[in-house]
């Protein structure tokens, strides 16, 4: 009975596989939004102001960072919790594939969230005249929380890895 239960539990990790595959659909949706923004920009390139262009650029960078985060979670999550990716050993293989454990994945995700939050906060500051001070304060507090959380997670990971 115990062996059957353990095998069933171990096999249940495959439930995560379609979820990781579903993230690729979100990645596709982000790509569509990215190019939609570019196609809206092109006809108006000579009419758009500098600040609006910078805000749009920050939005595109934001989408790119989120896309990178999705790729990182998709691949390393699949490798850590479902099965090893067998993509061959050619030049196309990502250098970090197979080398990122759950702890380092958490740190990379936290760093990505801080970067995304930084871009969003920069967009808020560039548009500060249209945003209430209360909202700016909350954006700043949330960003500081992300930064402190990422720092704490990195520090705890360092402590557990060194055993000190």
From Swiss-Prot:
The keyword Transmembrane helix applies. Keywords: Cell membrane, Membrane, Transmembrane, Transmembrane helix. Its main location: membrane. The keyword Cell membrane applies. The chain crosses the membrane at residues 15-35, 53-73, 109-129, 136-156. PANTHER family: UPF0114 PROTEIN YQHA. It is a multi-pass membrane protein. This is UPF0114 protein Sbal_0780. It is found in: Cell membrane. Pfam families: UPF0114 (PF03350). GO terms for cellular component: plasma membrane. Belongs to the UPF0114 family. HAMAP family: UPF0114.
